[in-house]
Design a protein with these regions (language model features):
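Short helix-loop boundary/capping segments
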Residues: 124-180
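Bacterial N-terminal signal peptides that target proteins for export
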Residues: 2-11
Length: 221
């Protein structure tokens, strides 16, 4: 009987420890529509901005200041239009020609339905870099040029009628984007002036789905 009792105690202790780890890994959360949390040089936003959006809760591992780790539990209806963009944002505040390098790194997982993982930067015009997507989603505007190689990655470029959008021809859940090279490609092509880079964000545009979308890590440096 004592052995059984000890085993039960040990099992309970293991479960309690596991639960403690799970809770402590997310030390801050919000269900507020525009809830945000400052983490080092980044601000993490819940950003539930679309029409007809459903509930969403943002969880943040507040120990991950150098490469934010956060996730959104979101339940969005199967209607058109982006409902939310939970993201990590960093202000760059340098002109395009002044930067020698600017790289966006990402590692993501999860998600069902219709969504796209993307960088969204303001230079000051909007420039998006899609890294992975699923379901009934697509960029604004129309195709401008296909199979453009920038910084070792091949993109299809969209613009007329919308922001400049660079969609990887080979989607990935983990990798990097040479943001400086993308901005300079636009400047050298006469598509942008040498503007000041404001915010660069990375996250997921959720159109529909009931799931958890996780940024295991991301950074812009």
């Amino acid at each position: 009987m004592k052995l059984v009792s000890n085993l039960r105690w040990f099992a309970a202790a293991v479960v309690a420890a596991a639960c403690s780890v799970m809770v402590s890994a997310a030390t801050w959360s919000t269900s507020a529509q525009y809830g945000s949390y400052t983490l080092g040089s980044y601000t993490i936003y819940n950003d539930v901005w679309g029409s007809g959006a459903g509930p969403q809760t943002l969880y943040i591992d507040t120990t991950s200041s150098s490469a934010p780790h956060f996730w959104a539990v979101s339940n969005q209806p199967s209607t058109s239009g982006v409902k939310s963009y939970p993201n990590a944002s960093k202000t760059i505040n340098q002109t395009i020609t002044a930067i020698s390098s600017l790289t966006g790194n990402f590692n993501v997982s999860g998600g069902t339905g219709s969504y796209d993982w993307a960088f969204d930067c303001w230079v000051p015009s909007e420039v998006m870099v899609w890294t992975k997507w699923a379901g009934s989603v697509g960029p604004w505007g129309s195709l401008y040029q296909s199979n453009v190689s920038i910084g070792g990655v091949t993109y299809n470029v969209y613009q007329p009628g919308g922001p400049w959008s660079f969609l990887r021809t080979s989607q990935t859940s983990s990798g990097s984007a040479n943001l400086a090279a993308i901005f300079k490609w636009l400047v050298n092509g006469g598509h942008l002036s040498n503007g000041t880079i404001g915010q660069c964000q990375y996250g997921v545009e959720i159109t529909s789905g009931n799931s958890t979308w996780t940024v295991n890590s991301c950074s812009v440096n």
